[in-house]
Amino acid sequence: MSPPLCPLLLLAVGLRLAGTLNPSDPNTCSFWESFTTTTKESHSRPFSLLPSEPCERPWEGPHTCPQPTVVYRTVYRQVVKTDHRQRLQCCHGFYESRGFCVPLCAQECVHGRCVAPNQCQCVPGWRGDDCSSECAPGMWGPQCDKPCSCGNNSSCDPKSGVCSCPSGLQPPNCLQPCTPGYYGPACQFRCQCHGAPCDPQTGACFCPAERTGPSCDVSCSQGTSGFFCPSTHSCQNGGVFQTPQGSCSCPPGWMGTICSLPCPEGFHGPNCSQECRCHNGGLCDRFTGQCRCAPGYTGDRCREECPVGRFGQDCAETCDCAPDARCFPANGACLCEHGFTGDRCTDRLCPDGFYGLSCQAPCTCDREHSLSCHPMNGECSCLPGWAGLHCNESCPQDTHGPGCQEHCLCLHGGVCQATSGLCQCAPGYTGPHCASLCPPDTYGVNCSARCSCENAIACSPIDGECVCKEGWQRGNCSVPCPPGTWGFSCNASCQCAHEAVCSPQTGACTCTPGWHGAHCQLPCPKGQFGEGCASRCDCDHSDGCDPVHGRCQCQAGWMGARCHLSCPEGLWGVNCSNTCTCKNGGTCLPENGNCVCAPGFRGPSCQRSCQPGRYGKRCVPCKCANHSFCHPSNGTCYCLAGWTGPDCSQPCPPGHWGENCAQTCQCHHGGTCHPQDGSCICPLGWTGHHCLEGCPLGTFGANCSQPCQCGPGEKCHPETGACVCPPGHSGAPCRIGIQEPFTVMPTTPVAYNSLGAVIGIAVLGSLVVALVALFIGYRHWQKGKEHHHLAVAYSSGRLDGSEYVMPDVPPSYSHYYSNPSYHTLSQCSPNPPPPNKVPGPLFASLQNPERPGGAQGHDNHTTLPADWKHRREPPPGPLDRGSSRLDRSYSYSYSNGPGPFYNKGLISEEELGASVASLSSENPYATIRDLPSLPGGPRESSYMEMKGPPSGSPPRQPPQFWDSQRRRQPQPQRDSGTYEQPSPLIHDRDSVGSQPPLPPGLPPGHYDSPKNSHIPGHYDLPPVRHPPSPPLRRQDR
């Protein structure tokens, strides 16, 4: 083989071997080299596409012709690029041997082996740096004939004779001990005894009596016999005394019997037992072993050369050299290519415009679009945007940079700068096109961040995530594997459910609170919680507790840590989160929010009061009698006037009246008072507010309301009305054998006695309301009835005035009732009596035909007008006390004639001996004035009112009068011939206001109008007078 080929062969073998180095070898380093490549690139080039149709009339303007179209087509070109790549080589002090880098000793180890760069390990019997000397201890020199000049049995180097002084002795001859305050090899360390002396060899402190401790920093307590010092060990710098061995275990960075000696260069860790692995001049920290690389190198072992474009400590500096120049990685000095010089390699060796070895060839570049030409070959350097051999061609579209040879080829998310085309790489990538990952131990943007991993193989170039060794987690690999992983590199997945963690060594699951089982797949049983489900729930009213924290899950209506508190008033539901909507003092159930209303209210939200007549929590019916009302909350009865007792069922006791029966009656001569308004009901023959006045002349009877029938100037008995005739006269009036025709007419007491009329008018004017009540009370007291009655009286006697006749009515015309209007009456009979006179136009249409009496006497029937409705339905049953219906009819009879026209079945026809009047229709109010007496008895004049509901309205309960509880007793037959039919009456204006309220739901009826209010529908019935007749029988109902 020729000699020129040998160097090439060795270089090829070296490159081949360099390519086979193992990158995981701790002694393998890397460097960057540049290389050029010729590639075929594609780019778009614009072309003008001419139109296919010719321009037919170009003279009309170019805008009328079809225009060419610009299209882009892909073309290819050859480009030469310079790039850099990372290559492996053995670190400084090492060389490659069979694929591995082994240490290199500059001097061959004669009788030993090279264990580190320039460090030999000699076999026994040999000494020296290269293990070539066999001098005995204490001798040195080539012939081993020179004694060492080292004292205290110190050894010396067998070649140089330099003494190796042990700890505590000063060089060069090891004869003098260390200066006080210093210790160790070559006396290079200061004592750490707080001013106290130390052992020159070990550095152990000699503490005074009052202090103790490894560094004399613990004070002793003084006693009677001196100082008492606590027992301490002698290990310094955090060393731990090992009792079994009786020695100190030193922390990282320290060594020696008491841990007083720092680690020598090249060692680190506990007891300095670990060897440093830093290359290329890097130093390791004696505590952590982390390498501090020399400028120009990086990596955890300082094995990598700084990337191209970076230099300095930890490759943190950026090179500031021309694009084609490289910088020295240690200090950043630029390494210029041929033809350039200067700190940045930007200065041309040739003057501008020339190039070549002698700088005599002129440049051919377009000066306007170029920078210059290369000083060696004359190649033009075009300004960005221009290309061509002479920089006179503009760059095609989508190209940039000098010579238009660059495309934005930024990979892995890199962004291309619009002006220069430089790529701003994404984190973890570097290079012109962001094609390369960050160098080892660097990551992030521009690979500027240093990895901080411990116990790791490498770190991610993107985010610095460490690839850890077995049992260590990601991050800086200083703690166990993260949750969910275990094993080598934490690549085994934990089989633990519900966020449980597993042991980084064994993978055993440690369950989170609330779960148990081999894989933490089972929830805690009900009633248990916490880690291992070992805790039991402490809840009162709950559906269990949270399996993790044990928080009680309260049932609706409960709250508190233990669900032991009921919801506060006004709240309800789960966690008492709902607000009650109960009104009027109602409360809600904490479980479901249902309202519990306060007494007197009802409804879902207690929004409605109890209906009238009801009270209490459930609006139960009131227990109050006689139409009294009760308090809606507690049901207390409020009695109407005239009633008393807890339930208002007891009438006022005799002699009392009014609300709560608190008033005392003021009635005399045996008169009784009305229990509601206190008005006196006088006995026969007495009148006045307090029954203190006797009947005036010409009157008699109850309240002196009946006129005497004894003739002018004659007296009558004030109680019975019997005439007190003068001698020679008898009868009533005091005339004998005089037949007077009967006249049906309205009469007043004035018609028979002027003095009585004047007194009657005065009494009516002053006591209208009282008279009504007195009359009703008197009737009740006289007859023992439960209801007041309407009376139709007969009156004999003739008054001057117009006559009226009641036309005959066939016998079949029976059972009539009236409509609400004024009507006129006529009297008719088969044998009409003498005509009767009625005064004035009041009854002008009524006639009085005479009718002879029959065998049994006169049978006079007053026939109602034709507009009174005919009623043929069967008579109803007995009068219902619960009904207030009033039937308006009119009939009278005092013989065994055809019977009355109107009969409701309450009185048999043969028993009917008196006229009957009742009211029924829509008419809400009716009055009957001046009821005349029947023949043969004293006359009575009275005033009464009747009320009843309108037809078609629901029946209403009649008022319960004060004497309704009395037993009915048969009354002596009055000779007045008056028959009374029960009907609900209103006594006076005051009693109207004292009536109990209507039942709920009934509107006020027409009959609730004030009495004697002459509105449409009011009418008066004229009194009727008839000839004397046999005494009538009365039927009590």
Swiss-Prot record:
Modified residues (Phosphoserine): S953, S1029
Annotated spans, Disordered: 824-891, 926-1037
Coiled coil: none
Cytoplasmic side: 777-1037
Glycosylation sites: N152, N271, N476, N575, N634
TM stretches of this protein: 756-776
Domain EMI: 25-103
SMART domains membership: EGF, EGF_Lam
Post-translational modification as stated in the protein's UniProt record: Phosphorylated in the intracellular domain on tyrosine residues. Phosphorylated on tyrosine residues by SRC. Tyrosine phosphorylation is detected upon platelet aggregation stimulated by collagen, TRAP and thrombin and platelet-platelet contacts but not after platelet activation. Tyrosine phosphorylation enhanced its association with SHC1 and SHC2. Phosphorylated when in the presence of SVEP1.
Tissue: Expressed in umbilical vein endothelial cells and platelets (at protein level). Expressed in coronary artery smooth muscle cells (at protein level). Expressed in heart, kidney, skeletal muscle, pancreas, ovary, breast, lung, brain cortex, hypothalamus, spinal cord, dorsal root ganglion. Expressed in umbilical artery endothelial cells, megakaryocytes, osteoblasts, coronary muscle and erythroid cells.
Domain EGF-like: 102-132, 225-260, 268-303, 311-346, 400-435, 486-521, 577-607, 615-649, 657-692
Protein name: Platelet endothelial aggregation receptor 1
Annotated organism of origin: Homo sapiens (Human)
